[in-house]
C-alpha cells in the first residue's frame, strides 16, 4: 500500500508537533499548515524534526480563511498526493471575562478554532468519500465540555467542534470515513504557560493525575484513532485529561 498522507493544521505548535512526530513514526507522510512561516520559524522547526528523522512538509495557510484553505488543498494534493488523514489542531486563546471581551477576540477564536474545521475539512471530505477511506480528528478541549473562566469564546468553539464531529461522522460512516474528537485537558505547552501562575497552580491542584498532560499523551490518542484498524470508532470523543473531568 502507498504511504498515507496526513495533514495536521497547526502542526508546528506544542501539541501539533508531537502529533506530527508520532504520525511520521507510524509511517505517514505528514504535512502541516502554518499561518506565518517566518514569524513561526517553520523552516528551523522542520529542520530540527528532520534531524530526528522526521521529514515533515509544510504549507502556509490561514485556516480561518476559506479561500486560502481551498488554495492550500490544491497545493498539498499537487505536492504530496491525496489526503487520507486530517487532524484539525490549529487553535488560539483570547481569554477575557465576557464583560470585558471585545468583538475581535470573540470572532478570532470562533474563526480559528471552529470555522477552520469547516474551512479545512470541506476541502478534503469529498475525496475521502470518493476513495472510501478517511480519518478526521478534531482537537477540542476539556474546556468545551465544562466551560472555563475567561473562555466563553474558546469553550463555545470547542463544544461546537464536537457537534461538527458527531454530525459529520453520521454523514461519513457509510463511505468509510471516520470523524472523531480528542479533548485534551491542560497540557504543558505555550498556551498553558500563558495562564497566570496562581490560576495555573490552582488548576493543577484539581487534576487527579497531579500534573499537566504532555503533548505525547494527546498524540497517542490521535495515532490510535487514525489507524486503518480504527474504522468502527466514529463520532466519538476521547478525553485525555488526567481524570480532571470524567463523564459517561
Ligand atoms: N479558576 C478559578 N478562578 C479563576 C480562574 C479559574 N480558572 N480564572 C480566573 N479566576 C479568578 C481569579 O483567581 C480572580 O479571583 P480573585 O479576584 O479572587 O483573585 C478572578 O477570577 C479575576 O481574575 P483576574 O484578576 O485574573 O481577572 P482578569 O480580568 O485580569 O483576567 C482571566 C481573567 C482572563 C479569566 C484570567 O484570570 C485568566 O487568564 N484565567 C485563566 C483562564 C484559563 O484557564 N484559560 C485556559 C487556557 S489553556 C487552554 O485553553 C487549553 C485547554 O484547552 C485546556
Language-model segments: residues:
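Short C-terminal tail/terminal secondary-structure segment
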Residues: 146-149, 223, 234-248
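Residue(s) in the substrate-gating loop at a strand-loop-helix junction
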Residues: 141
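Active-site helix of classical SDR
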Residues: 121, 157, 165
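Substrate-binding pocket helix/loop in short-chain dehydrogenase/reductase
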Residues: 97-98, 105-110, 192, 203
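Conserved glycine-rich cofactor-binding loop
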Residues: 12-13
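Conserved glycine-rich Rossmann-like NAD(P)H-binding loop of the short-chain dehydrogenase/reductase
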Residues: 26-43
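Alpha-helical segment proximal to the catalytic Tyr-Lys
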Residues: 126, 170-174, 231
Amino acid at each position: 500500500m502507498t504511504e498515507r498522507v496526513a495533514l495536521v493544521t497547526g502542526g508546528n505548535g506544542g501539541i501539533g508537533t508531537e502529533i506530527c512526530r508520532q504520525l511520521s513514526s507510524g509511517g505517514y507522510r505528514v504535512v502541516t499548515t502554518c499561518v506565518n512561516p517566518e514569524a513561526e520559524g517553520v523552516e528551523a522547526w522542520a529542520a530540527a524534526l528532520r534531524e530526528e528523522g522526521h521529514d515533515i512538509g509544510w504549507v502556509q495557510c490561514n485556516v480561518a480563511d476559506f479561500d486560502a484553505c481551498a488554495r492550500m488543498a490544491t497545493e498539498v494534493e499537487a505536492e504530496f498526493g491525496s489526503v487520507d488523514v486530517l487532524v484539525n489542531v490549529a487553535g488560539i486563546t483570547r481569554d477575557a471575562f465576557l464583560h470585558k471581551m471585545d468583538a475581535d477576540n470573540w470572532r478570532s477564536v470562533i474563526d480559528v478554532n471552529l470555522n477552520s474545521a469547516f474551512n479545512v475539512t470541506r476541502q478534503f471530505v469529498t475525496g475521502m468519500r470518493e476513495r472510501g477511506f478517511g480519518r478526521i480528528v478534531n482537537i477540542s478541549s476539556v474546556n468545551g465540555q465544562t466551560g472555563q473562566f475567561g473562555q466563553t469564546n474558546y469553550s463555545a468553539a470547542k463544544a461546537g467542534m464536537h457537534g461538527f464531529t458527531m454530525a459529520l461522522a453520521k454523514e461519513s460512516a457509510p463511505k468509510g470515513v471516520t470523524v472523531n474528537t480528542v479533548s485534551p485537558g491542560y497540557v504543558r505547552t505555550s498556551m498553558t504557560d500563558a495562564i497566570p501562575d496562581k490560576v495555573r497552580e490552582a488548576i493543577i491542584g484539581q487534576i487527579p493525575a497531579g500534573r499537566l498532560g504532555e503533548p505525547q499523551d494527546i498524540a497517542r490518542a490521535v495515532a490510535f484513532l487514525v489507524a486503518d484498524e480504527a474504522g468502527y470508532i466514529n463520532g466519538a470523543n476521547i478525553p485525555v485529561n488526567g481524570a480532571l473531568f470524567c463523564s459517561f
